[in-house]
Amino acid sequence: LRDMGVTTLYLCPIFESASNHRYNTADYTKIDPMLGTEEDFRTLCAQAETRGMRVVLDGVFNHTGSQSLYFNDDGFYPTLGAAQSQDSPYYDWFSFHPWPREYDAWWGIRTLPAVREDCPSYVDYIIENENSIIRRWLRAGASGWRLDVADELPDWFIEKIRAVVE
C-alpha cells in the first residue's frame, strides 16, 4: 500500500455490533471479533506508523444500536440498558416518549436509537473523560476519527472531539 502512495487507512466502524456494517454500535470499547482483537488493532497501528501511514477510525456518535450495552433492548448484556430501566446509567443518553417503547431514533429507524449529544454523561463518556472513547482509541494507536453523519452532530460536539484529537 505504501508503494502505491497510500498514507491513510480509513477503517469503517470496527466496534462490536449486531450487524456486519457496524453502524449500530453495541460497545465502543470492544472491537468486533470478526475483525480481530484490540492487540491486532494496536499492531496494525504500530505497523502503519513505521510505514509512514495513519489509521483513522469511523465514529458513529449520534446513535447506537438498540442491541447495545447502552440501550440493551434485547437484554443481551448483563448491565441495565436504557430500554430496560430508568435507573440505567445510560437512560439519560436517550429521549423516550414515553419510556420504554417510544424513543427518538436516527431517521426513524427503531434499531438505531438516537443519542442526546447534549447529555453530560454521554459527552464525558465519548469525549471528555480521561478514559473517553476518543482518548482510549487514540492511545491504542488511532491517528484520528471520521465522524459518521457529522452534519447531524452539533458543532460544539465536533469541536470538543477536534480539541481532544489535536
Show which residues each predicted segment covers.
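Substrate-binding/active-site clefts of carbohydrate-active enzymes
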Residues: D3-T7, I14-R136, A140, I161, ...
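Short catalytic-loop micro-motif centered on adjacent basic/acidic residues
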Residues: V56, G144-A150
